[in-house]
Amino acid sequence: MDALEKGAATSGPAPRGRPSRGRPPKLQRSRGAGRGLEKPPHLAALVLARGGSKGIPLKNIKRLAGVPLIGWVLRAALDAGVFQSVWVSTDHDEIENVAKQFGAQVHRRSSETSKDSSTSLDAIVEFLNYHNEVDIVGNIQATSPCLHPTDLQKVAEMIREEGYDSVFSVVRRHQFRWSEIQKGVREVTEPLNLNPAKRPRRQDWDGELYENGSFYFAKRHLIEMGYLQGGKMAYYEMRAEHSVDIDVDIDWPIAEQRVLRFGYFGKEKLKEIKLLVCNIDGCLTNGHIYVSGDQKEIISYDVKDAIGISLLKKSGIEVRLISERACSKQTLSALKLDCKTEVSVSDKLATVDEWRKEMGLCWKEVAYLGNEVSDEECLKRVGLSAVPADACSRAQKAVGYICKCSGGRGAIREFAEHIFLLLEKVNNSCQK
């Protein structure tokens, strides 16, 4: 997360759930306020994503649960429907390409605002200098993958309808704080927010509000005065399970599990997967073919993948295999996977479509694991798609999930686990 030290106007604590006022002088409302006939103020979402992250190199586009990190917040911002424009400010070509793939516009960040010492405020001011049409900036942190559109919708309403100059996200925590011991200065610690003689139970204490770094919304005139927080300001309290911030490597596996359970996966409701189609060469196998002395072909697969297929079938998901190559019957029978298989397929999409209709399924109920250009159309068409880590670049660009495992090295088992987690989300949403 970019430094924010320059961007806050100091103010005293506010009562719980109440707005607080910052130090800047009384601010003029943005043009058009209170005039129903004038064009509403331009609210722009801005994600700052420079390429020089020190904690995790290029972390903004590192895959989290199969999706580039920045993709989670871009999806939420675009689907919120409250922004006139959604931008990514970056100095890196790869980040720019990913941002455009998700539908965001790109502001090329200057070298001056891409330094380790540069602050978020520096980059936002630069963005505003190039975009006079923008009246309000919603600075969304790329490192907060559990952000939901509903959070952004409510904050936009607070800014537009309730007249706040700035709104920032917080999370409620129940943590007791103690002063730091410093040799030669303070030899003992002191409680900062509790009486040790009367330690409250969690349920008897409201806790405290902490910034969680997910977003900072502010009006243009406030930012131009040098503040991200000030004027008539308020906090927006996010749910604890949605308050995820990734800074170092140790945060990554925790965030991955959290986003799979609590992340936002798009507007369309998840469907229960009923059919998984898997390409044989490069997905089930590693793509290598060995030929014995008697001219028989030999292929291998990972036992973990066989177990993954078995678990899918036990959960009621049909698993079928497909290949454009003419695999021999002896080779297929030797796999002992008991899956319907189609080989020498010139049009994989037509074959999968035929299977789908045969089972009475919609495309959203079909999953596909592929790795080649010939799989591209299937990957784009199905409800859930994935590729192994070593898939070709065109296949990778067509999917929503890229496995950590390579083909023939556990990719099917990994994708199966991903499917099970999504099915859990489907079941939970149905219960709600």
Curated annotation (Swiss-Prot):
Motif BC1 motif location, chain numbering: 15-31
GO BP term, pick one: glycosylation
GO cellular component: nucleoplasm
Annotated spans, Disordered: 1-38
UniProt pathway: Amino-sugar metabolism; N-acetylneuraminate metabolism
Pfam family for this entry, one: CTP_transf_3
Residues given in the record as substrate binding sites: 50, 60, 109, 118, 120, 141
Claim: Transcription is one of the keywords in the record: no
Tissue specificity annotation: Liver.
CDD domains per UniProt: CMP-NeuAc_Synthase, HAD_KDO-like
Enzyme type, top EC level: transferase
GO MF annotations in UniProt: N-acylneuraminate cytidylyltransferase activity
Residues found modified as N-acetylmethionine: 1
Ranges annotated as biased composition (Basic residues): 18-29
Main location: nucleus
Keyword field: Acetylation, Methylation, Nucleotidyltransferase, Nucleus, Transferase
Omega-N-methylarginine: residues bearing it: 35, 50
Domain notes: The BC2 (basic cluster 2) motif is necessary and sufficient for the nuclear localization and contains the catalytic active site. The localization in the nucleus is however not required for the enzyme activity.
Function: Catalyzes the activation of N-acetylneuraminic acid (NeuNAc) to cytidine 5'-monophosphate N-acetylneuraminic acid (CMP-NeuNAc), a substrate required for the addition of sialic acid. Has some activity toward NeuNAc, N-glycolylneuraminic acid (Neu5Gc) or 2-keto-3-deoxy-D-glycero-D-galacto-nononic acid (KDN).
PANTHER family, alphabetized: HAD SUPERFAMILY MEMBERS CMAS AND KDSC, N-ACYLNEURAMINATE CYTIDYLYLTRANSFERASE
Protein name: N-acylneuraminate cytidylyltransferase
Organism annotation: Rattus norvegicus (Rat)
Species lineage: Eukaryota, Metazoa, Chordata, Craniata, Vertebrata
Gene: Cmas
